[in-house]
Amino acid sequence: MPRSRINGNFIDKTFSIVANILLRIIPTTSGEKEAFTYYRDGMSAQSEGNYAEALQNYYEAMRLEIDPYDRSYILYNIGLIHTSNGEHTKALEYYFRALERNPFLPQACNNMAVICHYRGEQAIQQGDSELAETWFDQAAEYWKQAIALTPGNYIEAHNWLKITGRFE
């Protein structure tokens, strides 16, 4: 049974109802509809913390989805799961792949920056200030991209860039 039929969360049910209506009225191929169904079920599983199920749905959606823009959001969500699982290298890979398909995903840039900043903090704790600076510089680049895409957002990142002298 599709996840959308068993989900008890009000918001997920509402989203599923609206998504089903849109799938009926917007002209799409059966493959696109099936890809979206897997994507929707992946989001539902992800919101409940069922990451293994979410990944299965996202991978199936990736197999079916051909639109680069839609694929970017699937890849982004896969990156979120890997971030939540502490698999930062995999997460960075998926965020990067999402940005290759859709360079207007500031949230992917931000998440990449957060991971790089975290790795910089880890390097400091390990006594490697040179490596830390490399990670912080990379975090700065990703935050600059996120801020350029959505000026006025990511205020804390903007302040960090100013405080550390990385804002240009």
From Swiss-Prot:
GO BP terms: photosynthesis
TPR repeats, residue ranges: 35-68, 72-105, 120-153
Primary location recorded for the protein, binned into one broad class: plastid
One Pfam family named in its UniProt record: TPR_1
TM helices/strands, residue ranges: none
UniProt keywords, alphabetically: Chloroplast, Membrane, Photosynthesis, Plastid, Repeat, Thylakoid, TPR repeat
UniProt xrefs under InterPro entries: PSI_Ycf3_assembly, TPR-like_helical_dom_sf, TPR_rpt, Ycf3/AcsC/BcsC/TPR_MFPF
Thylakoid keyword on record: yes
Location relative to the cell: Plastid, Chloroplast thylakoid membrane
Recorded topology in the membrane: Peripheral membrane protein
Cellular compartments per GO CC: chloroplast thylakoid membrane
Positions of disulphide bridges: none
HAMAP family reported for this sequence: Ycf3
Functional description taken from the UniProt entry: Essential for the assembly of the photosystem I (PSI) complex. May act as a chaperone-like factor to guide the assembly of the PSI subunits.
Family: Belongs to the Ycf3 family.
Name recorded for this polypeptide: Photosystem I assembly protein Ycf3
